[in-house]
Amino acid sequence: MLISNLMSPKSASGALVAMLLVCGSVDAKAQPSPYHEPPERHVFDGVTDDLLTAGLGVTGLTQQPGIAEPSKLSEWRDRRRRAIWQSWRALVDLRRWAYGSEARIAGVEYVAHVKASERLPESSFLLQIPASFDPNKPCLLVTAASGSRGIFGSLPTVGQWGLRQGCAVVSDDKGLGMRVTDPTGGWRLTASGHIEPIARAASPFPHALQMAHAHASFESEPHWGRLLLRAGKLALQLLAAEYPERAAFTAENTLIIAAGISNGGAAVLQALEADDAQFIDAAVASEPNVHLAGAPALYDYATLHAMLQPCAILAENLTEAPLGIVVGMNLARHTAWCERLAQDGLVSGSDVTSRASDARQRLLQSGIEPAALRLGAVNLQFGLWTSVAATYAQTYLRRGLNEPACGISFTATDAGGQPRELQVSERAALFSDGTGIAPTAGINIVARDAAGGLSNANASSYDTARCLRSLSTDISNLTQSLIVRGRTGQRPVIVLHGGGDALIPIAHTSRRYASLATARNPKFRFLEIANGQHFDAFLAIPGMEPAFVPMQPFVDRSLDDVQAFLTEGKALPASGILR
């Protein structure tokens, strides 16, 4: 049963819950509400609907949810269910479900939208309180969504662990998610998934969509850690509203663990460096997208891959490489790419074989692992590098819709590749189906050349890749605010990373971070998963196994380890390479 905006079964707490949600504190005059609107409160019975699987259970997560009519997605319950279903399928390998039975978890859920302040952008967070939560032995898992995802973007990876332990879980979207605006179409998608009309605006790029990660007026990335801390502190207030009969929940009387993967892992490590008050007791970060002094940032190595990998892939063993067969079907395109690189003096060699070998060698020399290069065909097939570079270029250069970097826009396209307006049914599915970064949910990447011609850039073109790469020097100067220094405090912290990670290179991120953190914190541990890679869901692709293993079991085990250290005094695992 779903009950929205109603009191807890603990009826005595109902009035105080309502007051705290509106005021943000017991004394409304002392502190104005941090929220755009009172957080929505929902209760789930664990049978027809639940916190972990939206009532779908394990079986339902592996099937298409029963939502046929797009109009039904106007209801929060249906948007939520589809969003949770999409997150599970995108982030974990459901073939390896190991959480028991149908894994439905009853409890209370808050959805909150926090205002921007002078120091922090707006963001949304999800607070889930399982029925097994013990207010007398409270624990809170604080996390942030991976990638550019919305509030459900960490539920399958770290949120599920917290819920199964009886911990409350708060997940912040880092100000990203599917906040989408179509100025020429006259509508916007709010953080809660509602379509709202806005005044139409003329644009030289009709139907170009404004997306939060690419175009937000307040760049959130330098603040991901503080957003995570803000969500954690507000979560304690909501817990106090939910359990008014006990003393206030504070960092001193609540076990608080921070955890996240990818961009969520970066948010965790940023939070540790900003956490002077020791709000967090322990942390786990998997494959974190962190920027270290002296190392290239994500944009740098993404654009290097975008330039070289379409040629370098021909130097891999395509009969064994996952999706290598797709490269074999497009040899002419890859051969031509090698030719263009040679013409521009970016690779050496007199034929395609020598040029591909040189391109591969240049990637290796830049610090990319051979195991990661083996996944080059997967990266190219999914347009990974163009997706990353196209969004981050707009973000770092602070480009608006009318002055896009490299002529790149995000828009729906017709059969001829021309921009069009998203249909009503497509807009209805954006919140649930979108990842926050194009291409996604019917939103494509298009590039305009100097003459105004359009091309679909989901899979990139040589000219688009070259343009994006040309911005790397300017952008590297703009990413200095993202540098982390390995300051974790004297608390248990485990960082883990796959040696075959083909998105976030281990040599430029976690290994460097570990060398700094280990010297400062005797409770810091670094686990390198030799055969791990970035996307567990990719393990279902033919050719991925047995060469690669899932990261999720190591994430769960690391969370078990820091919890046992804090609650039972058990020793932390030794740092090392796990095979």
What residues fall within each predicted segment?
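Sec/Tat signal peptide C-region and signal peptidase I cleavage site
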Residues: 26-30
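Bacterial N-terminal signal peptides
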Residues: 14-24
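Bacterial N-terminal signal peptides that target proteins for export
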Residues: 2-15
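C-terminal His-loop and adjacent cap/lid subdomain of alpha/beta-hydrolase
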Residues: 31-579
